[in-house]
A protein has these predicted regions:
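Metal-ion/cofactor- or nucleotide/acyl-coenzyme-handling active-site neighborhoods
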Residues: 1-143
Length: 143
């Protein structure tokens, strides 16, 4: 058993849960979940919902997203700064600094775990940024 913490913070040691161990990694819930699946010895991992890029219309989330107003101006701020290869390998998409960080962490972890543990990672997001090292498949393929 372990305790999951999103990032190391000194107060965690005061919880006195050393018996269980600590699991500190990743910059996002998705990055942490990816590494957790490796520790649980899964050999096939499927990513869904990891666009990590703005939509063609410049939106960061679906138009009915409750906190969309908190992201106003982000596309204009990031445009041209964090372009990357699109899912499917056709063209480029606009991303952000944090999404680029998440993607690079994924790519590093995917490469590492594929080489060391023969883990296969599928990206069934069907859009957004290409995550190098994944096998791109349609969402319905994963169902």
């Amino acid at each position: 058993a372990f305790i999951l913490v999103s990032t190391y913070a000194s107060f965690i040691q005061y919880l006195k849960l050393d018996y269980f161990g600590y699991f500190n990694m990743g910059k996002s819930v998705a990055n942490m979940s990816y590494l957790l699946t490796e520790y649980l010895n899964y050999k096939n991992i499927i990513l869904i919902g990891q666009d990590l890029a703005y939509a063609k219309d410049g939106f960061s989330h679906t138009k009915d997203y409750k906190n969309l107003d908190k992201h106003e101006g982000h596309f204009q701020r990031d445009k041209g700064k964090f372009q990357c290869l699109a899912y499917g390998g056709n063209g480029k998409v606009e991303s952000s600094e944090i999404w680029t960080t998440f993607r690079l962490i994924f790519e590093n972890d995917i490469n590492y775990f594929q080489k060391l543990f023969n883990i296969t990672t599928y990206n069934c997001t069907e859009g957004g940024a290409r995550i190098e090292g994944t096998i791109e498949k349609p969402f319905l393929w994963a169902c």
